């Protein structure tokens, strides 16, 4: 399955609750043509989970956006912008440090868990394979991860979005 599904997608974290897809699109469109902008909402409450994705038409625009927007203020909050790997690409455990973040293993919708879990002991947004921006972190994940004791926002060994340990969200 070597389809040319190359996506130039950025993960955008630390979003203000008030940030909507239109303001996300406005902030990032200065770097190039956007294919998509999406804010992830909680399934039950419909409220923003504080992160989203923007997809560019070309790689240069994506890299310029990461360089230009990471650490910048958007709607009163300092945001984090990283390259996101497509959910369908890469063989498990790949990426830097293996098994964490958006470069393989866990990540949003990847690994053994994905959005909403799916493992016997928990799951959460990134299952048992690492947090949203963890590079090599195991365990944790946004909503807990596949361990009863791990979890928290980034959980596990290698960090993650906001640190480790201490119960699920």
UniProtKB/Swiss-Prot annotation:
Q: Where is this region: Disordered?
A: 69-100, 125-169
Please state every residue range assigned to the domain named RRM: 8-86
Q: Name one matching Pfam family.
A: RRM_1
Identify the InterPro entries for this entry: Nucleotide-bd_a/b_plait_sf (IPR012677), RBD_domain_sf (IPR035979), RRM2_NsCP33-like (IPR048289), RRM_dom (IPR000504), SLIRP/GR-RBP-like (IPR052462)
Question: Mind telling me which SMART domains this protein's record contains?
Answer: RRM (SM00360)
Q: Where is the composition biased (Gly residues)?
A: 89-100
State whether keyword Magnesium applies: no
Predominant place of localization:
nucleus
What is one cellular component GO term in this UniProt entry?
nucleus
Q: Give a brief account of the tissues where this protein occurs.
A: Predominantly expressed in meristematic and growing tissue.
Q: Which SUPFAM superfamilies match?
A: RNA-binding domain, RBD
Which GO BP terms apply? RNA metabolic process
List the keywords (alphabetical).
Answer: Nucleus, RNA-binding
Provide the GO MF annotations for this entry.
Answer: RNA binding
Location in the cell: Nucleus
In UniProt terms, what function does this protein have? May play a general role in circadian phenomena associated with meristematic tissue.
PANTHER family, per this entry?
HETEROGENEOUS NUCLEAR RIBONUCLEOPROTEIN 87F-RELATED
Q: What is the name listed in the Swiss-Prot or TrEMBL entry for this protein?
A: Glycine-rich RNA-binding protein GRP2A
């Amino acid at each position: 399955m070597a389809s040319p599904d190359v996506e130039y997608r950025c993960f955008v974290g630390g979003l203000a609750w008030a940030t909507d897809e239109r303001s996300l699109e406005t902030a990032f469109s200065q770097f190039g043509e956007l294919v998509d902008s999406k804010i992830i909402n909680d399934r039950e409450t419909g409220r923003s989970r504080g992160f989203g994705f923007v997809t560019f038409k070309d790689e240069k625009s994506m890299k310029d956006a990461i360089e230009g927007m990471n650490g910048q203020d958007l709607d009163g909050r300092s945001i984090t912008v990283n390259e996101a790997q497509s959910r369908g690409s890469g063989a498990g455990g790949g990426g830097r440090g293996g098994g964490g973040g958006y470069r393989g293993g866990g990540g949003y919708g990847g690994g053994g868990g994905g959005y909403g879990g799916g493992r016997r002991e928990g799951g959460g947004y990134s299952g048992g394979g690492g947090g949203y921006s963890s590079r090599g972190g195991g365990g944790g994940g946004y909503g807990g991860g596949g361990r009863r004791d791990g979890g928290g926002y980034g959980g596990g060994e290698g960090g993650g979005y906001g640190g480790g340990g201490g119960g699920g969200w």
